[in-house]
C-alpha cells in the first residue's frame, strides 16, 4: 500500500476513492491513539482534563463533512474538540500552541482545486508532524481504537474567539505600523477571506480586497497565489503600493509590485532576510530554503554574507532544518514563508504584513526591494505518471539528466510531486532559450520511456 501522507499531509479528490468520511474518521481515531499516550496522558491526568484538539477548515464545500467525520472520530476517542471554523492553516498552528491543545487538524488542500481536499495535522506546540509520527498514525488506522463510554467521551464546542486571537497575534509581530501602504489583497476565495482584510486595515493600510467571496467551490479557481493575473491588473488600476495573493489556506503569499511585476517567494525571503540582518534579528546568518529556489537567491545572499541552506521540497522539511540549526527564516519559492520567531508554520498573511512593514521601514518601493536578487531563468514541466519511483530509477533517464545538466550553466532538478501523480522537471540556465530547450527535451525523453514501459 502506498504511503498515505504526502509532503503536506493527506491530499486527494474529496469523497473519491481515498479521501472519504470513513478515512477521515479513521485518521482522527488513529491520531487520538498516537497523541493521547505518554506525556500527553500524564499531563492531562495532572490537570484532570481530557485531551484537547483543535479542528478547522478552509471554505471548500467538502470541508463540512470531513470536519464532522474528524470531530466524531476524536470525540468518540475521548478527545475534546474545539471547532475553529474557517480559518487559515497557520492560524491552526498558532492556536494549538496558544490554547495549549494537544494537537490540531486543518482540513484543506491548500492551492489545489476546489474538488480536492486534505488533512493536515499539527502536534502539541503547533508543529507539523515528522515522517515517523505520520507512520505511527498510519500504523494505527486498522488497529483497535480508544472507545471510552459515558462521561469519558469528548465534547465538541465552538472555538468562538479563534479568529480574534490569531488577528491579535499577527498585529503583535509588526516592528512598525504600515500607515500609507495601499495594498490589493487577493484572498483566493479561501480561508484568508475573513481575517486578512481586517488585519491589514488594523495595521494601518488602505486595503482593496478581491476574490474574497467563497462559495465552497470557487477556491483557487483562476485566482490566488498561483494565478496573479487579476491581481496585477487591480494593482495597476488602483495605483497601489503592492498586491498580495494568498492560496486557499493562506499558508502561501506572493506579491505584485506597483508596475505589475510578480515578486515570488524567493524574492520575499531575500527581502525579509536582509531586513532581519539589518535589524539584528537574523539568527546564525542563515536562510533556509529548498532545492527548487532560484540560484539567484544563493548569489544575493552570498553578497550579503548570509548562508543559504537547502532542503528537499516541502515547508515541513524547511521547518525541521530551521529548528535543528537554530535559524529563524525559511521558505519556498512558491510563497511558503516561515518566520519562526512568530509562527511554527508557513504564514502568508504574516509574510505579507512584514513585507509591507519593510516598505515603510526603508522608504523604498517593492520594485527597488525586489532588485536585491537577479532571477536566473527557470523552466518547468510536469510529467503524469503513476509510478515516479521506477521512472526516476531508469538508467537511461538518469544518464540523460546527467548529460543535459553538464551542458548547462545552471541546474536540473527532477523530483516526484508530493501531492499529485506527477514528476516535476525544473531546468535553470542563464540563457532562457537553452533552459527551454533542455526542459522540453527532458520532458519528451520521459514520455518516450513511459511509452516503452
Curated annotation (Swiss-Prot):
Give the residues the record marks as binding Mg(2+): 110, 247, 249, 251
Q: Which GO terms of the cellular component aspect does the record hold? A: cytosol
Q: Which InterPro entries match?
A: A-D-PHexomutase_a/b/a-I, A-D-PHexomutase_a/b/a-I/II/III, A-D-PHexomutase_a/b/a-II, A-D-PHexomutase_a/b/a-III, A-D-PHexomutase_C, A-D-PHexomutase_C_sf, A-D-PHexomutase_CS, Alpha-D-phosphohexomutase_SF
Q: What does the record note about the cofactor?
A: Binds 1 Mg(2+) ion per subunit.
Report which superkingdom the organism of origin falls in.
Bacteria
Q: Pfam families under this entry?
A: PGM_PMM_I (PF02878), PGM_PMM_II (PF02879), PGM_PMM_III (PF02880), PGM_PMM_IV (PF00408)
Q: Which reaction does it catalyse?
A: alpha-D-glucosamine 1-phosphate = D-glucosamine 6-phosphate
Keyword 4Fe-4S present in the record's keywords: the answer is no
Q: Which GO terms describe its molecular function?
A: magnesium ion binding; phosphoglucosamine mutase activity; phosphomannomutase activity
The identity of this protein, by name, is: Phosphoglucosamine mutase
The Swiss-Prot or TrEMBL record describes its family as follows: Belongs to the phosphohexose mutase family.
List GO BP terms, alphabetically: carbohydrate metabolic process; peptidoglycan biosynthetic process; UDP-N-acetylglucosamine biosynthetic process
* UniProt cross-references to PANTHER family, sorted A to Z: PHOSPHOGLUCOMUTASE (ALPHA-D-GLUCOSE-1,6-BISPHOSPHATE-DEPENDENT), PHOSPHOHEXOSE MUTASE
Q: What is the lineage of its organism?
A: Bacteria, Bacillati, Actinomycetota, Actinomycetes, Micrococcales
List, alphabetically, the Gene3D superfamilies matched: Alpha-D-Glucose-1,6-Bisphosphate, subunit A, domain 3, Alpha-D-phosphohexomutase, C-terminal domain
| Top EC class of this enzyme | isomerase
Q: Which UniProt keywords apply?
A: Isomerase, Magnesium, Metal-binding, Phosphoprotein
Phosphoserine sites (modified residues)? 110
Q: What is its EC number?
A: 5.4.2.10
Amino acid at each position: 500500500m502506498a504511503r498515505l501522507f504526502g509532503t503536506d499531509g493527506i491530499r486527494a479528490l474529496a469523497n473519491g476513492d481515498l479521501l472519504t468520511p470513513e478515512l477521515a474518521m479513521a485518521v482522527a481515531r488513529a491520531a487520538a491513539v498516537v497523541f493521547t499516550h505518554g506525556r500527553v496522558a500524564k499531563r492531562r491526568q495532572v490537570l484532570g482534563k481530557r485531551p484537547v484538539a483543535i479542528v478547522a477548515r478552509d471554505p471548500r464545500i467538502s470541508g463540512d463533512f470531513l470536519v464532522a467525520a474528524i470531530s466524531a472520530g476524536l470525540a468518540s476517542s475521548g478527545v475534546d474538540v474545539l471547532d475553529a471554523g474557517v480559518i487559515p492553516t497557520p492560524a491552526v498552528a498558532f492556536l494549538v500552541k496558544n490554547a495549549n491543545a494537544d494537537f490540531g487538524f486543518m482540513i484543506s488542500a491548500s492551492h489545489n482545486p476546489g474538488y480536492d481536499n486534505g488533512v493536515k495535522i499539527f502536534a502539541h506546540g503547533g508543529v507539523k508532524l515528522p515522517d515517523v509520527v505520520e507512520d505511527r498514525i498510519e500504523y494505527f488506522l486498522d488497529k483497535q481504537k480508544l472507545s471510552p463510554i459515558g462521561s469519558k467521551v469528548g465534547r465538541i464546542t465552538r472555538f468562538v474567539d479563534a479568529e480574534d486571537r490569531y488577528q491579535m497575534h499577527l498585529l503583535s509581530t509588526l516592528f512598525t505600523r504600515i500607515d500609507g501602504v495601499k495594498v490589493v489583497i487577493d484572498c483566493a476565495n479561501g480561508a484568508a477571506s475573513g481575517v486578512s482584510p481586517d488585519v491589514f486595515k488594523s495595521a494601518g493600510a488602505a486595503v482593496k480586497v478581491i476574490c474574497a467571496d467563497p462559495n465552497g467551490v470557487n477556491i483557487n479557481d483562476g485566482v490566488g497565489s498561483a494565478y496573479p493575473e487579476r491581481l496585477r491588473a487591480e494593482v495597476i488600476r488602483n495605483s497601489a503600493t503592492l498586491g498580495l495573493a494568498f492560496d486557499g489556506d493562506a499558508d502561501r503569499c506572493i506579491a505584485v509590485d506597483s508596475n505589475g511585476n510578480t515578486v515570488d517567494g524567493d524574492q520575499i525571503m531575500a527581502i525579509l532576510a536582509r531586513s532581519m540582518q539589518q535589524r539584528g534579528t537574523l539568527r546564525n546568518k542563515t536562510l533556509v530554503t529548498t532545492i527548487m529556489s532560484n540560484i539567484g537567491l544563493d548569489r544575493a545572499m552570498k553578497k550579503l554574507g548570509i548562508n543559504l541552506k537547502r532542503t528537499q521540497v516541502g515547508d515541513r522539511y524547511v521547518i525541521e532544518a530551521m529548528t535543528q540549526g537554530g535559524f529563524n527564516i525559511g521558505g519556498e519559492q512558491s510563497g511558503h514563508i516561515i518566520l519562526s520567531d512568530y509562527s511554527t508554520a508557513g504564514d502568508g498573511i504574516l509574510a505579507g504584513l512584514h513585507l509591507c512593514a519593510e516598505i515603510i521601514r526603508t522608504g523604498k518601493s517593492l520594485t527597488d526591494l525586489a532588485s536585491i536578487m537577479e532571477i536566473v531563468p527557470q523552466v518547468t514541466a510536469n510529467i503524469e505518471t503513476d509510478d515516479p519511483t521506477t521512472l526516476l530509477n531508469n538508467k537511461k533517464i538518469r544518464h540523460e539528466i546527467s548529460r543535459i545538466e553538464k551542458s548547462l550553466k545552471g541546474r536540473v532538478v527532477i523530483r516526484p510531486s508530493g501531492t499529485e501523480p506527477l514528476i516535476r522537471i525544473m531546468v535553470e540556465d542563464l540563457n532562457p532559450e537553452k533552459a527551454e530547450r533542455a526542459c522540453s527535451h527532458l520532458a519528451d525523453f520521459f514520455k518516450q520511456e513511459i511509452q516503452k514501459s
